[in-house]
Amino acid sequence: MNWRSEHIWIEFITGSRKTSNFGWACILFLGSLGFLVVGASSYLGRNLISVFPSQQIVFFPQGIVMSFYGIAGLFISSYLWCTISWNVGSGYDRFDRKEGIVCIFRWGFPGINRRIFLRFFIRDIQSIRIEVKEGLYSRRVLYMEIRGQGAIPLTRTDENLTPREIEQKAADSAYFLRVPIEVF
C-alpha cells in the first residue's frame, strides 16, 4: 500500500508478516512437534501416536535423534513466530519534496535498536540504483545511493520483482526524487 501526493510519497513495507512465513512457521512447528512426540513415545515405550508401534523405534539412537530434531525444530519455529509477532522488517519509506527530507523507518528485534530510523536530505541522494543478478536464482534489488553513506536498499532482497516491476518502481522513485537511474 502506498500513499502519494504532489509533495509527499509514503511507501509502506510489509516486513516478516508474509503468508510464506506463516506457512513455514506452522509446518516447522507441527513437524518438530511430531518428531518430539515420536522421541518421547520411544523413551516411554508407549504409543503416543497410534500410526506405528513404539517398539519399532529404539530410544537409543533413533529416539534420541528424533527428540533432538524435535527440540531444534521447536527453537527455529519459535524464532519464526517471534519475528512474525514483532513484525521485524516492516516500516515505511517517506519522501518529502517540500521539506527536502527522506525518512526510512523499519522495526527491528527488541532491544536498544528496535526502531531503525534513517533521515537525510534529498539533495544528498546521488541516484537510484538497480542491481541485477541473473542466473538460477535471479535477484533484482533497488537501492538509493546516498552521498557519504553508501547504498540503502528500497526493496527487500527476497522480493522477486519482474524486470518490468523493478524498472517501473525505479522510474517512479527517480522521477519523484529527480535523480538519475543507474543499472549494475
Curated annotation (Swiss-Prot):
Topology relative to the membrane: Multi-pass membrane protein
Entry protein name: Photosystem I assembly protein Ycf4
TM helices/strands, residue ranges: 22-42, 57-77
Task performed by this protein: Seems to be required for the assembly of the photosystem I complex.
InterPro entries (alphabetical): PSI_Ycf4_assembly
Protein location: Plastid, Chloroplast thylakoid membrane
Keyword Transmembrane: yes
GO CC field: chloroplast thylakoid membrane; photosystem I
Species the sequence originates in: Acorus calamus (Sweet flag)
UniProt family annotation: Belongs to the Ycf4 family.
